[in-house]
């Protein structure tokens, strides 16, 4: 990918309040993530999410995060909220992801929780398998493995990411204003995803942290474009 024209996309995930969404939009977020997993502290009910999504301006994507949800549940959420992109973050198989996405006709990203023994070859195979299975596959989201679902708040070994898929991945896992510049400069991902790194409490965002995070990403973009 030509870094001279690349702008790292930014997703702020786990929003539950209108004021936090407006802060994220004002700071320049490209996508807003809503967690439809009832056991998450960042869970938002579909009717509440629908009210927030109705306030989104053009060209900002609403992403719905699901964990082991069945097709009927996803269909109901899509019908109620009009989310534009699905994010599968549980133990869904390749076939299940493809089938659910097809049932609602929405593109999807697949979260891969990277373990200490995950290899670069594993990541390449994941991408190949999902891309072969569905025309709606939009890319991998790489997060850190923890013994629970949803955001980890922890960083994994970025050196595992193969250079040839890095420009297509969404980088997640423990990102914050303190490491976002380094992450983008080293990995050059298509997008970054942050939740706990811009919070003052689970599900409650901090406007100063949002602004600092997005500024840190833009510092990296500017540095890459100057090379």
UniProtKB/Swiss-Prot annotation:
One GO MF term on file is:
phosphoribosylanthranilate isomerase activity
Q: What class of enzyme is it?
A: isomerase
Pathway assigned to this chain's UniProt record: Amino-acid biosynthesis; L-tryptophan biosynthesis; L-tryptophan from chorismate: step 3/5
Q: What is this protein called?
A: N-(5'-phosphoribosyl)anthranilate isomerase
Which positions make up the signal peptide? none
Q: What is its EC number?
A: 5.3.1.24
Keyword field: Amino-acid biosynthesis, Aromatic amino acid biosynthesis, Isomerase, Tryptophan biosynthesis
Query: Biological process (GO) annotations?
Result: L-tryptophan biosynthetic process
Q: Which family does it belong to?
A: Belongs to the TrpF family.
Q: What's the short name of a Pfam family annotated to this entry?
A: PRAI
Which catalysed reactions does the entry list for this protein?
Answer: N-(5-phospho-beta-D-ribosyl)anthranilate = 1-(2-carboxyphenylamino)-1-deoxy-D-ribulose 5-phosphate
InterPro entries assigned to the protein according to its UniProt record, in alphabetical order: Aldolase_TIM, PRAI_dom, RibuloseP-bd_barrel, TrpF_fam
């Amino acid at each position: 990918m030509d870094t001279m024209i690349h702008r790292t996309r930014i997703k702020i995930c786990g929003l539950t309040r209108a004021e936090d969404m407006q802060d994220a939009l004002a700071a320049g977020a490209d996508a807003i993530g809503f967690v439809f997993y009832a056991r998450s502290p960042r869970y938002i009910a579909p009717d509440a999410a629908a009210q927030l999504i109705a306030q989104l301006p053009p060209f900002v994507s609403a992403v719905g995060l699901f964990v082991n949800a069945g097709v009927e549940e996803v269909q109901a959420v899509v019908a109620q909220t009009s989310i534009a992109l699905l994010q599968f973050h549980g133990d869904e198989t390749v076939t299940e992801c493809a089938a659910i996405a097809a049932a609602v006709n929405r593109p999807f990203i697949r979260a891969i929780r990277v373990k200490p023994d995950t290899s670069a070859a594993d990541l390449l195979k994941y991408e190949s398998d999902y891309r072969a299975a569905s025309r709606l596959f939009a890319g991998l989201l790489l997060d850190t493995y923890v013994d629970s679902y949803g955001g980890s708040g922890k960083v994994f070994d970025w050196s595992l990411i193969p250079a040839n898929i890095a420009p297509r991945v969404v980088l997640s896992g423990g990102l914050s204003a303190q490491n976002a510049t380094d992450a983008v400069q080293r990995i050059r991902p298509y997008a970054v995803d942050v939740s706990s790194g811009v919070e003052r409490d689970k599900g409650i965002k901090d406007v100063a942290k949002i602004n600092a995070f997005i500024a840190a990403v833009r510092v990296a973009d500017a540095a890459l474009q100057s090379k």
